[in-house]
Amino acid sequence: MINIRKTHPLMKIINNTFIDLPTPSNISSWWNFGSLLGLCLITQILTGLFLAMHYTPDTTTAFSSIAHICRDVNYGWVIRYLHANGASMFFICLYAHIGRGLYYGSYIFLETWNIGVILLFTVMATAFMGYVLPWGQMSFWGATVITNLLSAIPYIGTTLVEWIWGGFSVDKATLTRFFALHFILPFIILALAIVHLLFLHETGSNNPTGIPSDMDKIPFHPYYTIKDTLGALLLILVLLTLTLFAPDLLGDPDNYTPANPLSTPAHIKPEWYFLFAYAILRSIPNKLGGVLALLLSILILLFIPLLHTSKQRSMMFRPFSQLLFWLLIADFLTLTWIGGQPVEHPYMIMGQLASMLYFLLILVLMPMASLIENKLLKW
């Protein structure tokens, strides 16, 4: 009897992706984040769908529709907080996934890496627009400040901003289009994620050593299905703990005040997962310079394959590079902390130094360390 799993046109795709996929036998838990991101995306799409059934994208009713969801809809508060904290979990998994890629040299798979960077941009855009929807103070002012950055573009800036706003300020038109885009983008992300996976399966997974593992592959199922299930259970545990015990831990209290264009909050800041980029933006006194640095802080990921000077793929056997990598992680966390602080004396200079170190590490120090390591190994 011919196995339907291997012959049926649809089952064959599923089989080659999740069942009979040849996988390196030594991939660690850092390889769990890909499947966790898939889980986060599905959770966000489902909770978002149920929220959209009760939400009204109108400046007069948006805020009260969220209150209605939390008070009057059956388990509406659970859905709302799962969605809000699900975004935080999404970004934790994203940053861990990117960090894993940087450490183990996964960026050598160019197509997979570049689609991953596009995915990162798309997820960031989606999260930003989602934050605007509750129409609280931070939603409104966050939207105003971030969209206003585009006015730094010479010649077309102001026109571009007004085109995005759909008027002369962030208003009803802006909220409606942000809702429409926030609804459609996750499906685009899903499509991109499938392409991301498609390109990955062209080459096969990397592994901690960075050495080709074609001679030592095992089937994905049952080994990695069970491993991914454990990861998924841990993710769900953390998400539920956060949602049920501290739903507002990562939010901003200002967003419980309805949006008021006449009153600016004392400290305008985005959600925690954008703070590192916000700190880089604020550390440059010039508007256009700040916007360029902000863009480059993410776009720099596209240049990482070009900056790979080592003869080894992974950092597993490269102590200097490891040291600089963890310095980069510490710098990322420092920038995240500084982005949430007010613009005053110690934080300003710390932010500028941390921003400088961020670019210096990626563009200069890490490639140089790799060259030194090559020399030491007489390669």
From Swiss-Prot:
Keywords: Electron transport, Heme, Iron, Membrane, Metal-binding, Mitochondrion, Mitochondrion inner membrane, Respiratory chain, Transmembrane, Transmembrane helix, Transport, Ubiquinone. Heme b b566 binds at H97, H196. Binds 2 heme b groups non-covalently. GO terms for molecular function: metal ion binding; ubiquinol-cytochrome-c reductase activity. A ubiquinone binds at H201. Belongs to the cytochrome b family. The cytochrome bc1 complex contains 11 subunits: 3 respiratory subunits (MT-CYB, CYC1 and UQCRFS1), 2 core proteins (UQCRC1 and UQCRC2) and 6 low-molecular weight proteins (UQCRH/QCR6, UQCRB/QCR7, UQCRQ/QCR8, UQCR10/QCR9, UQCR11/QCR10 and a cleavage product of UQCRFS1). This cytochrome bc1 complex then forms a dimer. Heme 1 (or BL or b562) is low-potential and absorbs at about 562 nm, and heme 2 (or BH or b566) is high-potential and absorbs at about 566 nm. PANTHER family: CYTOCHROME B. GO terms for cellular component: mitochondrial inner membrane; respiratory chain complex III. It holds the Pfam family Cytochrom_B_C. Heme b b562 binds at H83, H182. It is found in: Mitochondrion inner membrane. The keyword Nucleotide-binding does not apply. It is a multi-pass membrane protein. This is Cytochrome b. Its main location: mitochondrion. The chain crosses the membrane at residues 33-53, 77-98, 113-133, 178-198, 226-246, 288-308, 320-340, 347-367. GO terms for biological process: mitochondrial electron transport, ubiquinol to cytochrome c.
